[in-house]
Amino acid sequence: KYQNWEVTDPECWIPHGYACVRFDSRGAGCSEGFMSPNSPKEIEDLYECIEWAGTQEWSNGKVGMLGISYYSRNQWRIAAKHPPHLTAIIPWEGGNDPYRDSGYHGGIMSQFLERWSKHQVMNIQYGRGENGRKNPNTGESATGPHTLSEEELAKNRVNAFDELKKHPFDDEWHQERRADFSEVKIP
């Protein structure tokens, strides 16, 4: 009932003594701000969220991450930054190389980011309000209380596909969006 696509099922984990927390990235869901998926800023924000969770009174100080696809990719990147409270990750079915995995297959631009942006990212952007998805448990907007115009929404997000087109080679833009596996020190 409370599971969110691509992340853990709290009804499975909570009875075993785990607290489950899912964060909305900046500009997504009910979090205001400029939406920039897969950006270094998003990883900084998630690092702070991990440290927040590790210091709550209900927390034992050990934070783990679990998830598929996008959440998998983020786990590797965050683990390589060594947040003190992160003790384990369980990533699966997620790539680490944005250039080869989702950007340019064999040097040929993939349409993945264009489709993903339209069907996944834009649908969960903060500010969709009345026009956005509803939380199936509460009936409230899952994209914040405000309803912004399409122009305002566009000003509050990066166009990932347009950004990809600016980087046809495996340059710094792609490199700062992948984890350095040699820096991942946790199980």
Where are these regions (language model features)?
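Short, conserved helix/loop micro-motifs enriched in His/Cys and acidic residues
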Residues: 25, 183-187
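Cap/lid segment of the alpha/beta-hydrolase catalytic domain
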Residues: 1-54, 103, 110
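Catalytic nucleophile serine of serine hydrolases
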Residues: 31, 67-72, 93
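Glycine-rich helix-loop-beta junction characteristic of Rossmann-like nucleotide cofactor-binding loops
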Residues: 55-57, 182-183
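Accessory cap/linker subdomain of secreted extracellular hydrolases
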Residues: 3-9, 15, 77-184
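Beta-sheet entry/capping signal
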Residues: 19-20, 61-64, 85-90, 187
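Alpha/beta-hydrolase fold nucleophile elbow
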Residues: 57-70
